[in-house]
Amino acid sequence: MLPPASPFLPASPFIMSFAAPSYAFATPFQTPAASPIRSLMSYAMRPGSISMAGGYPAQELFDIDGLTTASNQVLARLGACLQYSNIDGQASLRAELARLTAERGLACDPDTELAVTGGSQQALALVSRVMLQPGDHAFIESPAFPNSVQALRYTGATVHPVASGPQGIDVDALDEMAARLKPKIVCVVASFSNPCGATISRQRRLRLLELAVKHRFLIVEDDPYGELRFSGEQVPPIAALAEGEARHWAVYISTMSKTMAPALRIGWLVAPAEVRRRCVGAKAADDMASSAWIQEVVAQYLANGRYQQHVPRIRAAYGARCDALAQALHKYLDGRVAFRKPEGGMFFWVRLNGEADATRLLPYAIEQGIVYVPGKAFYADPQQADLNAMRMSFATMNEGLITQGIERLARALDACEANAPVSVSLAA
């Protein structure tokens, strides 16, 4: 039975329609940034699927006991940790991070050169914001992590990719481009880059510093993976190699996301005092401060010595998984793919031989139950994309699953090369 008609409304129902508003979005946000990596997560989460797509650390390797102990210690003695934090970070954590950074070869003043951030992504965004504006130019190695490219683009600056290979960024190309375009920032992941797994040699890092002084640009080194070295010689951060005037042109960024846990959202930057001071001001406008409680927990964890015990354990686990992926590629795809085994980090950059296209192969791979990220997702300029390439992460799977995943990929490649029907349809 219908309710009685309201005396305040007309007897005949009607529908009001409104045109969608036309918002005056800022130029960098007028076209929402698509994430080809996130778009693959629904396939990666299918039951029975083996995902090499994500850049996540292995959840089973998180040191829950160590973090629980540190958290209980902090809450028992420090109720103030539930208050607001200093904008630049808790003094206890800045001191611990300065010690950790010094162990990596880079000495810094925790009060004037180091600041705590919400992961390394916020650190890059802050440096970009205080250095760049519309009309400026920024360089980034190519291929590169898409979110890093977005952090630069959201400032309104023009972002230029600089070719990168197995030894990292092409310094000769950088020199020529910098002479023409006068960049204010050059961004690199110098150790075990995402997506290529490449490491820049000491000699090339020194050359980067020479070019920074010559062209007066700021080197921003993002170092999420440096602790995860399985083989080869450790290379100091770029800023640690800087001498004289070069010390004014290098910023170091790092994070606890890959070694402790990403949910902590603890990163930090080490920068010349004037750059650091402005980044802290930008952070105040951004989020006021990072969580004091989480900062104190991480500081306590470091002070307890658990970090020094934990990193070798995850390094060994990831090293074994890296070996397993290399062996599986040799066993099941020998002669059909090319790759360089990384000395650390989480990623392989695998190239299909011949005319194979990693994007065309992907639906066949998903159908077989294996997911990766096509290489074109990592190019700031799609016209430069290597269509044969794919990024594969070995971090979140044990050796058995890695082997099974590559066996599936071989079957997918067989089907793709035979132009077999495929049930999976991906959006363009």
What is the meaning of each model-derived region?
Residues 17, 367, 383-428:
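PLP-dependent enzyme catalytic core of the Aspartate aminotransferase-like
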Residues 28-119, 126, 303-304, 371, ...:
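N-terminal small-domain helix-loop-helix segment of the aminotransferase-like
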Residues 80-216, 226-245, 318, 400, ...:
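Conserved core of the PLP fold type I
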Residues 243-316, 418:
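Conserved core segment of the aminotransferase class I/II
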Residues 276, 280, 350-391, 399, ...:
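Conserved C-terminal alpha-helix-loop-beta "cap" of PLP-dependent enzymes
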Residues 299, 312, 316-326, 338-351, ...:
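Conserved glycine-rich beta-strand-loop-beta hairpin in the small C-terminal domain of fold type I
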